[in-house]
Amino acid sequence: MDEFSFPFQPYDIQLNLMREIRQCIEQRKIGIFESPTGTGKSLSVLCSTMTWLEAEELRISTDLSTRLGEVHTKITECDKITTADNWETAVREKMRAQDVETEILEQIQSRERLQSRIDQARRGMVEVSRKRKAPARDTDQFLEPQDEAAPSEEYNNDEKSEKQRDSDFFDDVDEEEEKPLKCLKIFYASRTHSQLEQLAEELAKTRFQPRIVTCASRGTLCVNEEVKKLKLNHLINEKCMELRKNGMSEKEKVQKLEKGTTKKTKTCATSCEFYNSTQIEDVVNGVLSNKLKSTLEVSKQGKLSNGCPYFATRKSVPQCQLVLLPYQVLLHDGTRKAWGIELKDNVIVLDEAHNVLNTISSLYSAEISTKSLTLALRLIREYNAHYKLKLLAHNLLYMKQLESLTSKMLIFLNSQSKEDVMTMAQLARNLNILEINLFKLAEYMEKTDLCKKFHGFYMRLQKEEIKKENEKPKLTGIQKLMAAKEAEPEPEAEPLPPPKPVPSPLFSLKSFIDALTNKCEDGRIIVEKSATEAKFRFMLLNPADRLSEVVTSARATILVGGTMEPAQLLVETLSRGSIGADSIRRFSCCHVIDDSQLLAVTVERTVDGKPFQLTYQTRGADTTLRSLATSIQALIPHIPNGVVIFVPSYDFLFNFQKKMKEFGILKRIEEKKAVFTESRQPTSDVWDRFSRAAKTSKGAILFAVVGGKMSEGINFCDELGRAVIVIGLPYPNKTSVELRERMKFLDTQMPNGGNLLYESLCMHAVNQAIGRAIRHRRDYAAVYLFDDRYAKESTRRKLSTWIGDRTQVKLGFGEIIRKTRSFFEANSKK
């Protein structure tokens, strides 16, 4: 067994990667690591981080014992000093030593308490304090149902927030225990839940058995059918909060049993049966004892034991050593706090991190339309009118500010005749809201659960309107007889379906207000106009600060991906903050394949000898498209099985295929291979049909778009991707408002920053597309880069190292054909 307990004999590149990761963690740095798909990246990261975790736990334990012994020795030495000259000094030193002793003992006791809790979990024990704290806001609700939409008291003394309420609910330890149980951990974040599940499967291949939990949304983990049927996450979240609020506390259950009450109240009937602390603790025990390692297992156990899997997962996080979580839980400040994620002294791994800056920008974006603002304004006004006698002065101030802000936003949007871009300061001046403190307004909405109250008020108004529509006027006895006599028999009307759940517009409004609390220079407000409505859209221009908040909080951060290059923008972004350049490590792996398994060439001239460069000016020209189509036709017969051709955009793709058809070239290509085209529709079966055809002796071609769904996440291994052809350099559209603003912002932050972003977006997309092929050690493929700009050294340096170092340039088309033929003949004999 090697130094990292790798489950197989590791390749040199895997050992190098694991050593680099371990060193990065030990030195408390930020690492940017590129490891091509097919090189065992996930296993390498897991084995290196788990090896460090084991060693660090042992080091901490040994260090505490050693330090405690040294302190005891120091105290004993101080006690032996009796001379008058040294006595005062000895007393001071002894007091300092005793303070250190207390600190060490607290750490040792905390570790012992944690181990005791794990032992309890393994025995399946659930310790419930006799003095269990009941959720504060549930205490009186069971006995006297309240108006859930009613305004709160002065919000500084308001009811407990959802997080506080859940904390009380989970407070199963004695009040004397001040510090929560927690341990050293690895936070491993990836884009999707399926990728996290794959990581758990990879871990199962190793000898490591850390306490592991996978964070997921309520939509993924909820087992309450009444809630799950709502489908949409925001509706699921709202329903979950509503049912938990309606549930009675443990104290109330005891009171009811003592009174012998059997009648179910309305509140009790609409609570969640799975929100039960004892049953939730059962599920937590399963996680901490390593019996439940996946979201599927946790969900099954939760349903079986009537314990909520979502809250069991949340409660398990502090005591788990490996926490798998989606990007949004780690990278979004509010979500991270809601989950109780503590980064201090822990290690972060961000998988597929090439797009981390765009991901953060997306997580902090917000928008609101005239339709939502109109409905929100109506709700706020009706709410204020309905509760005007209950609103305290402080609450009334904020509610009037909210009404004023909403009204001014709506008036401004309706008055706009064209699209516009503005800073947050400009928006405040345009709306004339300089007197409104948006920070305090957002805080008020958060602490009073205002969105939730409005949702209850909104749903109640909807029900009342439907009820009014269904009500018939009351008739006297004679009127009923006359009406029955005059009326012709009618078929019995079908009952009206229940109203579809609609989210309250206050959630969108609050998200937008939250966005406005970012630094003025860090964001832009875009006003969008369409034929039917207008909207405000907030765009975060500076995700660097948000990323810095995360990485500087942790002990070390590992940014890893199959295509991290070009990484210069990421490095510059991190360096602009409080992170010094010397704190960043970079490492790029070679591929596990041999040079003989990859043919990578730039196609600078087409088959007719003409220079090829696909630019905005040339991409629609018949001469350009004919030369390109003829070259593809000449190349295809020499490539077996599947060929994937990536083009810059859907518009180019459809025009190119139309022209190939006009030229008669498409028909000749189809005689050699079946041709398929990526659809804009997400439900298309093109992939399945291409996969079947590619494995035949004739083979198949798939035309796809760089940046489309086929260029990221799809596995073109073996026969599915014997060749990848990339047409042109897929630069993003510079007329895009978002891109233009981001480039302008980066130009103010660093020299040539906008162009660096422009180049990075293009080359990341190219590297992602190329990375779809060659997915394992014995795979092989050819890569053709159609554009003479790929021959430039500056462009090739932005390719992933394993591609750029192997790319051949300055070849004639005839030589490319000969190399292609030789390449596939040699590999077919292996």
Swiss-Prot record:
Cell compartment(s), UniProt: Nucleus
Keyword field contains Disulfide bond: no
Coiled-coil segments, which residues?
none
Q: What biological-process terms (Gene Ontology) are attached? A: DNA repair; establishment of sister chromatid cohesion; positive regulation of cell population proliferation
Cofactor list: [4Fe-4S] cluster
Record-listed E.C. numbers:
5.6.2.3
UniProt: [4Fe-4S] cluster binding residues: C222, C240, C272, C308
> Locate the Helicase ATP-binding domain: which residues?
1-403
* Claim: Iron-sulfur is one of the keywords in the record: yes
What's an example of a GO molecular-function annotation for this chain? DNA helicase activity
Note accompanying the cofactor annotation:
Binds 1 [4Fe-4S] cluster.
Q: Where is this motif: DEAH box?
A: 351-354
What changes when the gene is disrupted? Uncoordinated and sterile with cell proliferation defects in germ and somatic cells. Hermaphrodite gonads have fewer cells with 13% of homozygotes having only one gonad arm. Most hermaphrodite mutants contain sperm but only 20% contain oocytes that develop as far as diakinesis and those that develop exhibit abnormal karyotypes. Mutant adults contain significantly fewer D neurons and seam cells than wild type. No poly-guanine tract deletions but double mutants of chl-1 and dog-1 display increased deletion frequency when compared to dog-1 mutants.
User: Which residues participate in ATP binding?
Assistant: S35, P36, T37, G38, T39, G40, K41, S42
Q: Please report a single Pfam family linked to this protein.
A: Helicase_C_2
Segments for region (Disordered): 124-173
Class of the enzyme per the UniProt entry, highest EC level: isomerase
Q: What is the reaction catalyzed?
A: Couples ATP hydrolysis with the unwinding of duplex DNA at the replication fork by translocating in the 5'-3' direction. This creates two antiparallel DNA single strands (ssDNA). The leading ssDNA polymer is the template for DNA polymerase III holoenzyme which synthesizes a continuous strand; ATP + H2O = ADP + phosphate + H(+)
Q: Name one GO cellular component term.
A: nucleus
UniProt lists compositionally biased (Basic and acidic residues) regions at: 124-140, 157-168
Q: Which UniProt keywords apply?
A: ATP-binding, DNA damage, DNA repair, Helicase, Hydrolase, Iron, Iron-sulfur, Isomerase, Metal-binding, Nucleotide-binding, Nucleus
InterPro entries (UniProt xref): ATP-dep_Helicase_C, DinG/Rad3-like, Helic_SF1/SF2_ATP-bd_DinG/Rad3, Helicase-like_DEXD_c2, P-loop_NTPase, RAD3-like_helicase_DEAD, Rad3/Chl1-like
**What PROSITE patterns does the entry give?**
HELICASE_ATP_BIND_2
Q: Which family does it belong to?
A: Belongs to the DEAD box helicase family. DEAH subfamily. DDX11/CHL1 sub-subfamily.
Q: What is this protein called?
A: ATP-dependent DNA helicase chl-1
User: What organism is this sequence from?
Assistant: Caenorhabditis elegans
